[in-house]
Amino acid sequence: MRQPQQQGQQRSKRPLPNQPVTWLGGLTPNQFMRDYWQKKPLLVRGAFPDFEPTVSIDDVLALCQDDRAESRLVRQTRAGWALHHGPFTAKQIPSNRSSRWTVLVQQVNTLMPEADLFLDAFRFIPEARLDDLMISVAGPDGGIGAHVDSYDVFLVRPVASGGGRSQPGLSPPCLMGPH
């Protein structure tokens, strides 16, 4: 269930169907839906050049402790990949200095209304196909292992790979399509 928009919070504009969009690599939403959606991936480097996250890494880690949030912790061990489901205690969340872990939180847009604004850029997708905003945070060498999703995924990466922290000057790539 979506949270009501907070007073003073402005909705960003959803893209017009026939207007080229920078984050789609100059394609219009109609062209993207016709030529790429559920057909082939599209990689757009620097898709959101002015992107400033409204949700911090600390916010995401705090959500992992919230029993309303669907959260997972993936660790790579010598024996392979280990998956743990939240909510987690503060002690269960790895420190920034440890490596080979990733935390994923689903439905962030329903728990933090400011995160819902980011989804406006994707509102040209049929509402039945636009589910939620999932945010992940990873330590150095973190990941979730090879996998196939049973749903469509838009990946937006606003931090440096493997660093787990935002680094100024990096433009996030955007990968869209079947994943």
Regions found by a protein language model. Give the residues of each.
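Non-catalytic, conserved peripheral segments adjacent to functional cores
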Residues: 38-40
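Active-site region of the double-stranded beta-helix
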Residues: 2-4, 11-35, 50-55, 61-179
